[in-house]
A protein has these predicted regions:
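N-terminal secretory signal peptides that target proteins for export/translocation
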Residues: 1-9
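Solvent-exposed adhesion/ligand-recognition segments of exported proteins
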Residues: 3, 13, 18, 22-199
């Protein structure tokens, strides 16, 4: 027989910029193994948020939705699922927390997920992200951006970072980390997609 070629291509980035051992221990403090995002409030568009034990489900009804969260942390044994109308649907999650969002468990979505926290986003070694596409940033967008689908990331004054030490897989979309400091020591795969690490 002959070797069957796969049509999907992927990129794997392994950039060793900073040892995890150098991170202050306080960065990882305060998130339990079953921690889930809190205070989800839909600001534009339509979605329902429900929780079942250590799993949080977001059922998105509109093509684009904006959700404001008090905190957006996912513990090591916790899962957040976004069920979206299609692969190009966008869920914009804006986080009000004074601390960085810590993603230590599973984040799943069939569409595009924006995770915006001016104080940073950190994917730990145990993070497993499997989405259509993901944007993690310390910048922000407006409700009108979400409605129009034309996103202009607005600058924030915080000198925070987006850091990945885990596994991030995007099936056909963009993986974009945008912050004053971007660190990737984990694995990023964008099947038929694009990877942007922008500081």
């Amino acid at each position: 027989g002959h070797v069957k070629e796969t049509k999907t291509w992927f990129q794997t980035l392994r950039l060793s910029l900073l040892s995890l051992a150098l991170l202050p221990i306080s960065l990882w403090a305060g998130v339990s193994d079953v921690q889930l995002p809190t205070g989800g409030s839909v600001t534009v568009g339509s979605a329902q948020v429900s929780q079942n034990n250590n799993t949080l489900n977001v059922h998105q009804n509109s093509q684009n939705v904006g959700i404001q969260w008090d905190t957006f942390n996912i513990g090591q044994n916790a899962t957040v699922n976004f069920y979206q109308p299609n692969t190009s649907s966008i869920a914009v999650n804006r986080v009000l927390d004074s601390n960085a969002s810590q993603i230590m468990g599973k984040l799943n979505a069939n569409g595009q997920v924006f995770l915006l926290n001016p104080n940073g986003v950190i994917f730990s070694k145990t993070a497993q992200v499997n989405v259509g596409g993901i944007v993690a940033s310390t910048l922000n967008v407006t409700d009108s951006d979400i409605i129009s689908g034309n996103f202009t990331l607005k600058n924030q004054s915080n000198a925070a970072s987006v850091e990945n030490y885990g596994s991030v897989i995007a099936n056909g979309g963009v993986v974009a980390f945008i912050a004053p400091t971007v660190i990737n020591e984990g694995q990023i795969q964008a099947h038929n997609g694009v990877i942007h690490l922008t500081a």
